[in-house]
Amino acid sequence: MNRASGVLLPVFSLPSKYGIGCFSKEAYQFVDQLREAGQSYWQILPLGPTGYGDSPYQSFSTYAGNPYFIDLETLVKEGLLTKKECKEYDFGDKAEIIDYEKIYYSRFKVLKKAFERFEKDEVYDNFVKENAHWLDDYSLYMAIKDSKGGISWNEWEDALKNREETALENARKELVEEIDFYKFQQYEFNKQWSELHTYANGQGIQIIGDIPIYVAFDSADTWASPELFQFDEENNPVAVAGCPPDDFSATGQLWGNPLYNWEYHKKTEYNWWIKRIRHCLKLYDVVRIDHFRGFDEYYSIPYGNETAVDGAWMPGPGMDFFYTIEERLGKLNIIAEDLGFLTESVLQMLSASGFPGMKVVQFAFDSNGGSAYLPHNYPENSVVYTGTHDNDTTRGWYHSTDKATRDFAKEYINTQRLDEDDLAWDFIHLAMSSIARLCITPMQDLLNLDDKARINVPSTLGGNWTWRMEKGKFDEKTVERLKRMTWLYERLPEKMKSGIKDRY
């Protein structure tokens, strides 16, 4: 990886006509702006379908794409919808906030209209055949789930819950149209994303995607393959994932995701993981692995506990996992999310893997000094962020942190006062100027937005994953400023360097 930079902007945060960011013309325009700004990467969040809580890290499938991201204008061009039909539904009226309730009640209705006009062809048939290993279970799962009012598979009758063949065959016959509807959604999603991804690559922009380490309990993955997880004889979790208590939370974090049966995964040579990562490498150019330390050891909380207090660290697969993956798939473009407290064994695993870890500027300013997140301490093989989707915006963070931290930050930046209208750019400057090979800046920091633009507050429910960039905010002035800073710190793509020397 050459010295470069990029922007973090979730697909759902793009501006668009229909309530949520999608694979619309605005996505293509954003790619063009990244190219003009001298960027090399567009980092996004997981693309999977979301449910209660709207988190892309709690998806109904590790393979499926979010149908909300299907561009309706493209379906109009294909003759599957009319513009009038698109305007008949209420997708929400706020340009800067996603109204998921309105999206849920409108998007599937309009997609159903498109599905009713859709005619299967050879391309569609090939897609269904090539993706049958996950698409068949996912479409059946969602169709059954809908028929039962949206409840999770563990609440279904035993015959379906335990996947008895007669019950599955009856469901396939009774729900044939609903199953086909979900296959249609995935076909359109994959077609549109593939076109956008190809366009981005053609403009010199690579996509950084995201693999959540865990899957949701309410998912096609757990229902179809319970042997992959730590379940009892009745397919209930024995233990679930989370984080132990720390200075930020006296009771820790109870994520609730099922834990992997690593013994089974090792016995099968991590075959499920290899298929999953291979699929991700079709969607993305670089993959960020969430919660990297979970492969060294994972925090196990007894199922049914209300807090994470009584959990314990258990050994994960370690480098055996990554050696096996590399043996099967070759050298991988992976970024390791290694934030938080790291043991010596995690650091050894990161070093052995050769993957770049993450550095976050907001974490740097412990008034005691010596933080590994201070830019002068970064290794070259790392990816620096001003903040991530789980942090406040830099402007929001600065105003909410304590005086000692603010004073240290100002001293480090070598200023007595930070300009309110420009605050985030001082921290972008620190990230860009660092030795870290790759610098990724969240869009909210490029726009110097406050805490109202925060994407997620971990361990909270409601109000997350809703921020959208308003149309026109990422304007020519900001694009030009980003380009100049990218040039200044020698992060421009090679083909752009020669043509810009005289200008600057």
Which stretches of residues belong to each language-model region?
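Alpha-amylase-like alpha-glycosidases and glucanotransferases acting on alpha-linked glucans and related
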Residues: P10, S16, D54-Q186, V215-I440, ...
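Catalytic domains of carbohydrate-active enzymes, especially glycoside hydrolases
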Residues: K25-T50, L283-Y284
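Outer-envelope exported proteins of Gram-negative bacteria
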Residues: L45, Q206-I208, P212, V286, ...
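Conserved, well-ordered alpha-helix/loop/beta-strand core segments that scaffold catalytic motifs
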Residues: Y182, Q186-V215
